[in-house]
Amino acid sequence: MRMFPLLPLIAVGLFGSGCSSSDTRPLPRPPSVDVPRFMGDWYVIAHIPSRPEREAFDAVESYALRPDGRIQTTFTYRKGSFDAPQKSMHPVGRVEKEGNGAIWGMQFMWPIQAEYVIAWLDESYHQTIVARSKRDYVWYMARTPQVSDSDYQQAVERIAAMGYDLSLIHI
């Protein structure tokens, strides 16, 4: 039995479902993102996870610019606990023409592409918030595995101002 016709339906179930908000305001975003500077490792500090990430611990998102201009992503995590073996996912990102580098499409499997908006990025490229217009998933990430309490609180306030339900955030 061929499974390929079912893959798009499975992808919608995995990535398209979630608790979305009725907030329809456009997400904020920086005036521009220097995509090559954005590349590298980002530690997930807090997030409202997608279905595959719900049991992710010790998560790191790594980006590398490919020769074709797309972004090779490696999401490493430990499923279920900090002691679990490391697992990874390998979606490919594409920077959209509009958005000055802040709007990407992230493809986990063809032809499904998820919205990926860099909604906030500090000037030093050390902290970021990646969001979706549906307000169903959000990621607060930093270049280091820990941030100060003040930075964390400011990020949570930014996420709330975007219209997210803070009770869904995982730390």
Predicted features, each with a name:
Residues 1-7:
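Bacterial N-terminal signal peptides that target proteins for export
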Residues 13, 18-169:
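A beta-rich soluble binding module of mature secreted/lumenal proteins
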